[in-house]
């Protein structure tokens, strides 16, 4: 069986990375959203998990996010939030969060409320609420590339 590369990933990554440059961050596709502070990289994904995505959007609303947008946007800004809040998190809170994340049975509710996760989400909500036009412009440009990606790869 021949495996082909998905076309358009580099273009999406470049777009995200150019946006992340304002925080001196890099972008890389992966199987899930994440932030790696050792390489200043935000990992992003096109994988959809309807249950988790719905729960994450609801969590952002509970935190006071006034902008209705795609979970991709919330996820990107949440990961940026990790980069912006890492230094204010105590070692004890960080270690506790990492220990709890090792539990494969952790619920979304507990995960979202871990010290490192909630502070990153709070940062994201504040940034999104205070920069609505910028966030909408970012998402509009990204949507064009994502739709092109789906079409080129016969995903939708």
Task: Name the predicted role of every residue range.
Residues 28-70, 80-87:
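Active-site scaffold of zinc-dependent metalloenzymes
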Residues 2-3, 15, 38-42, 47, ...:
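Active-site-proximal or metal-binding-adjacent scaffold patches in catalytic folds
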Residues 84-96, 129-138:
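Substrate-binding/catalytic groove segments of enzymes
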Residues 70, 86-118:
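Post-HEXXH active-site segment of zinc metalloproteases
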Residues 76:
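A conserved beta-strand element that flanks and buttresses the S-adenosyl-L-methionine
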Residues 8, 12, 73, 116:
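Hydrophobic (often cysteine-bearing) scaffold residues that line and stabilize catalytic clefts
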Residues 103-156:
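Long, well-structured alpha-helical subdomains associated
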Residues 7-24:
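Zn2+-dependent metallopeptidase catalytic core
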């Amino acid at each position: 069986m021949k495996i082909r590369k998905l076309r358009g990933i580099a273009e999406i990554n470049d777009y995200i990375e150019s946006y992340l440059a304002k925080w001196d961050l890099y972008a890389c596709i992966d199987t899930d959203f994440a932030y790696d502070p050792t390489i200043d990289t935000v990992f992003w994904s096109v994988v959809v998990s309807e249950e988790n995505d719905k729960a994450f959007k609801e969590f952002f609303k509970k935190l006071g996010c006034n902008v209705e947008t795609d979970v991709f946007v919330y996820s990107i800004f949440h990961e940026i939030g990790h980069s912006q809040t890492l230094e204010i998190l105590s070692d004890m809170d960080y270690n506790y969060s990492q220990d709890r994340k090792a539990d494969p049975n952790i619920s979304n509710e507990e995960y979202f409320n871990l010290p490192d996760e909630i502070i990153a989400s709070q940062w994201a909500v504040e940034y999104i609420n205070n920069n609505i036009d910028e966030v909408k412009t970012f998402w509009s440009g990204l949507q064009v590339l994502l739709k092109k990606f789906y079409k080129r790869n016969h995903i939708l």
